[in-house]
Regions:
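Surface-exposed, charge/polar-rich loops and edge strands
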Residues: 1-39, 43-170
Length: 170
């Protein structure tokens, strides 16, 4: 049975407890469910299906079990491992102190976007399929990279650090 990762937008320890989230995914019929960190990352086994169907199942179960649904983006674990092995940051001069982030899109962008784009030290470097690769230097203004990403791609997305994606893919 294939293994998948679900990345949920807007989940944090203050608005969703991980045991309840795990139970919601189990109620959706998924097996081998495990949460990773406290930020809405869920790994699970499911019969082979489209990402869209799995997303709908997870969101319906969260609505039923938790009383709210979080935007859910599903990727096969094998796809995440290939993404990590490809090191999409390698062609770019990313400072060692920069945070590397991956943004997962729910669908394809509506317009063709010329990359790289930069704003206040945040750079959107590349896009491959439904993933966007960015880097930023921590800034007193807060997460300016999210302003740039949402302005460019909308809000049907969620972002994780490169390190978090690696933990989820293990």
């Amino acid at each position: 049975m294939p293994r998948y990762a679900a990345f949920l937008r807007g989940v944090m320890p203050t608005n969703c407890k991980m045991p309840a989230l795990k139970a919601a995914f189990e109620a959706a019929g998924f097996t081998g469910v495990k949460t990773v960190l406290g930020s809405g990352n869920v790994v699970f086994d499911a019969r082979s299906s489209s990402e869209a169907v799995l997303q709908q199942q997870a969101e319906a179960a969260m609505q039923d079990q938790l009383g709210q649904a979080f935007l859910t983006i599903v990727r096969p674990i094998e796809q995440l491992r290939k993404l990590l092995a490809s090191d999409p940051y390698k062609p770019f001069n990313v400072r060692p102190t920069a945070k590397r982030i991956v943004t997962f899109l729910r669908g394809q962008p509506k317009a063709k976007i010329k990359l790289p784009i930069e704003l206040d030290g945040a750079r959107i470097l590349a896009m491959k399929g439904g993933e966007i690769f960015s880097a930023y230097l921590p800034n007193p203004k807060g997460p300016v990279f999210m302003t740039l990403i949402q302005k460019t791609f909308g809000k049907d997305l969620t972002t994780r650090t490169w390190d978090t994606v690696a933990k989820v893919a293990r």
